[in-house]
Amino acid sequence: MTVQEYRQTRFTPPKGATEILLVRHGESRAARADAPFPLVDGQGDPELAPQGRVQAEQVGQRLQRLPISAVYVTKLQRTTETAAPLCRAIGRQPNQNPDLHEVHLGDWEGGVLRIKAHENHPIYLQMQA
């Protein structure tokens, strides 16, 4: 008996449609209890770690061949740093959009979430359940 296979095909947007590609920022620097991240509008704003800069270069190289008409970033430096290699490669400036932002972590901003996760804090474990 032959089993039918259903192969995945690449989605092609219809003519006139806008295709949106979301890119997560590169790895940011490690959190430390004695050196909390600076805050921008109440959100932790660490810079990219060395590995994050490598990731940003790699994503820039990969995406530079696509027909990109605009690049949008948040106020946070890690998003601007991640977009920089791509923007250089395609000759565009990133558009900072104040309506784009991450989930606000309240008291767990500034790297505290990472520390609580490492400590297996009960609230963090409950969030993961």
Put a short name on every predicted segment.
Residues T2-L21, E27-Q96:
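Active-site-proximal alpha-helix that buttresses catalytic centers in soluble enzyme cores
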